[in-house]
Amino acid sequence: MNETIACTPESAVFEAPQLQFNEEGWGPCELPDAFKDIPYQPFSKSDRLGKISDWTGTAQTDKKYPNKYASQFGGGNQYAYYHEEDETTFHLVDSARIQKQPHQRGRFRGNLRNQRGRGRGGRGGVQAGGMTTLSKNATKGRDQRRGTTRKWGARPPPKIRDASVAVRPDWVTVEEMDFPRLSKLSLPNVEKGEDITTCGTLEYYDKTYDRVNVKNEKPLQRVDRIFHTVTTTDDPVIRLLSKSHGNVYATDAILATIMCCTRSNYSWDIVIEKIGDKLFMDKRDNTEFDLLTVNETAIEPPNEDGNSLNSPRNLAIEATFINHNFSQQVLKSGEKEPKYKFDQPNPFIGDDEDGEVASVAYRYRKWDLNNGIELVARCEHDAVLLTPQGDTQFLTIKALNEWDSKVANGVEWRQKLDTQRGAVLANELRNNSCKLAKWTVQALLAGSDQIKFGYVSRAHVRDSSRHVILGTQQFKPQEFANQINLSMDNAWGILRCIIDICMKQKDGKYLIMKDPNKPMIRLYDIPDNTFESDGEEEEGDDGEAFQTYAYGPSAATTAAATAAANAATAAAAVAAAAAAAAAAATTTPAATETVATATTEATTPTTATKTTAPAAAQK
């Protein structure tokens, strides 16, 4: 069936369009007439349209990130429309600042993208919710008005400290141990120390000082007593114990310095002598090792010159002076007062000892650190306390001192101590973290039941000779260690790491020194005759001989017992322990003979000092 379809004029006719073929690229080859003379501007749907429709300039729904949806296309505003010809609609408006809601105000800063080049009075751009961004000059001027301008901007200048001892050219660096690596060490499950022998006499603590407060302060008295600061190899008891007990020997102060080295900022050094399979850790004679640091870990530690009242060395002397006097003032002293006596007398008191000796007891203990390492150390107690139940507790007494709260960026003790004692202690933990950690380690090593802190402040901020006691506070050593985040496992791990490194070395003399400006310690191999001055005192950088606890030009330094008297006293103290352990000695005959020869030929000097007032009080 054939049909014919007729096309009428009303039917749609398809006409093929003309297609342009661009051989050199893509897109049209010619610009249509409809789009000529029209400027091109990048466009984004999230862009603000300009001043005509910008009625949401101060409104902001997202307070946390006001410019979260800002786009890079908003950078081109040169084609925005501005009505400048018609002035008939000109009128004044209220330009008062709109009070914003306090929702997270000032907590977060907006996205600063696309803010470059938009200075004061700039047109368009993304508004940061009405927030004003200060320029660099404006911020600098504000800081100058507030008195917070520093040479180094927001950061304090680098602190250049001096080393505790000058490194000599003939010293060989054996090992460098940085603090981040040491802080990761751990030696768990170290048993408590076992007593070998105990010596000395203790006085009882006066509980009336627990009631001292800011309104009922007590002046700090000057107690004229002798404190013995004897190093390891000069201790006659340790010399005899080295023949039958242990293979590593030290004092509690030396051990605490090593265990808490990751918290220290100031430089210090310890001498180690390796004889056979034995290590002797010593402090150098006539150094400032026993002086207490002040604000060592503060953000801005004391950095005044040496002649200033608040120089680091003068503050250390003042803190040691306060600590010695406070630890003796809070005791019940007198001939009629009862005293707690240990099995053996003080091994450092000779027959020709002049003056009264401070209340102190020595506990010689040993620890098993595994792998054949047995540590023997001398620990100290400061006082004894009788509880209401009749139990006897041993105390470690220390003093915290306030010197100038404004300079030290601290808390005013006389205003906060009675009401906010926790804030005062927290500030001390921040400024003296290393010192408090070492005190805690010493109390734990000695097995003290309580550690008692005294808060001592200057009577006047510019007078370092007169002080007052504002209060006391006591803690259990283990609980206080947990509060200050002190891990004994890490402390034992650091000590064991250093012992292992030294045990691998050949026999000789070594020195561990904290780098004065870097968080690391170094082990040096030094000649055997280093620091041996043949009776002459080693001079410091200023040409003056160091004097431990030299509080003033008239500080009295008394000679200690002779070598024979000390050896006889020590022999009586450890006779029973040495006889019992003679058969169980683990050292070889050759090593024992070497140690015996080395300890017999050496002398046994002891350092005994009287506490007197600081130099400022005697001028």
UniProtKB/Swiss-Prot annotation:
Instruction: Region Disordered: list its residue ranges.
Output: 99-160, 588-619
What's the domain of life for this entry?
Answer: Eukaryota
Q: Which Pfam families match?
A: eIF-3_zeta
Q: Could you tell me where this protein is found in the cell?
A: Cytoplasm
Per the UniProt entry, what are the Gene Ontology biological process annotations, in alphabetical order? Answer: cap-dependent translational initiation; formation of cytoplasmic translation initiation complex
Q: Which GO terms describe its cellular component?
A: eukaryotic 43S preinitiation complex; eukaryotic 48S preinitiation complex; eukaryotic translation initiation factor 3 complex
InterPro entries in the cross-refs: eIF3d (IPR007783)
Q: Name one GO molecular function term.
A: mRNA cap binding
Q: Compositional bias of type Basic residues: which residue ranges?
A: 100-121
Which region ranges are annotated with the description RNA gate? 288-302
The UniProt keywords, alphabetically, are: Cytoplasm, Initiation factor, Protein biosynthesis, RNA-binding
How would you summarize the oligomeric state and partners of this protein? Component of the eukaryotic translation initiation factor 3 (eIF-3) complex.
- Domain free text: The RNA gate region regulates mRNA cap recognition to prevent promiscuous mRNA-binding before assembly of eif3d into the full eukaryotic translation initiation factor 3 (eIF-3) complex.
The protein's job, in short, is: mRNA cap-binding component of the eukaryotic translation initiation factor 3 (eIF-3) complex, which is involved in protein synthesis of a specialized repertoire of mRNAs and, together with other initiation factors, stimulates binding of mRNA and methionyl-tRNAi to the 40S ribosome. The eIF-3 complex specifically targets and initiates translation of a subset of mRNAs involved in cell proliferation. In the eIF-3 complex, eif3d specifically recognizes and binds the 7-methylguanosine cap of a subset of mRNAs.
What family does the database annotate?
A: Belongs to the eIF-3 subunit D family.
Recorded protein name is Eukaryotic translation initiation factor 3 subunit D
Native source species: Aedes aegypti (Yellowfever mosquito)
